[in-house]
Amino acid sequence: MMRLISIAFVVVLASCGRSGSAISKQLAGSDSLVINFNTPQTNTIDKIVTTTDDKAIKKLRNYVDGKTTEAYKCGYDGNLLFYKNGTLTGDVSFNCSGDGCLHFIMTVDGKLTPTSMSNEAADFLKSLAEGKGWY
């Protein structure tokens, strides 16, 4: 009996290591990214940043894959468009400027999923909007 319990425990632990969040699964393998920055208080695109840099894509994917939060109604500063082999895999809207409104939101498995944005992520996006290209 003890052996059966031990085997079951090992199987559960092994399966936990292979599973990722629904967001990470949806954005996995993204090979290019387009970031649209809006003119403040509008939905008009003011600046576009594109990259195929794996380090930058991974960094932004990890930022988006944060803790689920409430859906704020603060407007959006832009969106991240993740692509894999030319196919859109994720359209993520973000707010990186509003006090108390820092967040990402995207559709995952047919439902809107808001996630929290760290100050580091907000600073990173703001620096890209200002034309700085560090990753």
Please report, for each region that a protein language model flagged, where it lies by residue:
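Residue-level signal for mature regions of secreted extracellular proteins and peptides
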Residues: F9-V10, K67
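Sec-dependent signal peptide recognition
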Residues: M2-I7
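C-terminal motif of bacterial Sec signal peptides marking the signal peptidase cleavage site
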Residues: L13-S15
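Function-determining sites in protein domains
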Residues: G17-Y135
